[in-house]
């Protein structure tokens, strides 16, 4: 990368990211704990002010232990399931199912109107 003009804003860990959000009064953010197949210790970096939900299922698999750890630690979080294919095809199962043995997930938000603001507001409510 040739442009380093904003390098001072880079965050190299979730803890740094949450600190930056707090320092800059950034509360209108969407952050989900996400598992890429390996165990992730959410006790090391969880901030309930910003991380309102945890991704428990994706085309990478189902990671129930993530929400079990959250509940054991007393975290109050929502549950989301995503495709995680980075292709803009919500709920699509190909190629994830062939590679990882799981079909991508979908998340439901109960809102009064189908609008970005309503969905974001809903995502911040447990």
Sequence positions of predicted segments:
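Extended, charged catalytic domains and RNA/DNA-binding interfaces, predominantly
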Residues: 1-126
């Amino acid at each position: 990368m040739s442009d380093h003009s904003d390098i001072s804003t880079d965050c190299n860990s979730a803890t740094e990211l949450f600190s930056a959000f707090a320092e800059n009064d950034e509360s209108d953010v969407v952050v989900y704990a996400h598992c890429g197949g390996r165990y992730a210790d959410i006790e090391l970096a969880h901030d309930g002010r910003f991380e309102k939900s945890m991704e428990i299922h994706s085309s990478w698999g189902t990671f129930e232990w993530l929400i079990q750890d959250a509940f054991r630690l007393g975290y109050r979080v929502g549950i989301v399931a995503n495709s995680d294919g980075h292709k803009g095809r919500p709920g699509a199962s190909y190629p994830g199912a062939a590679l990882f043995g799981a079909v991508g997930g979908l998340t439901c938000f109960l809102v009064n109107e189908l609008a970005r603001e309503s969905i974001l507001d809903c995502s911040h409510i447990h």
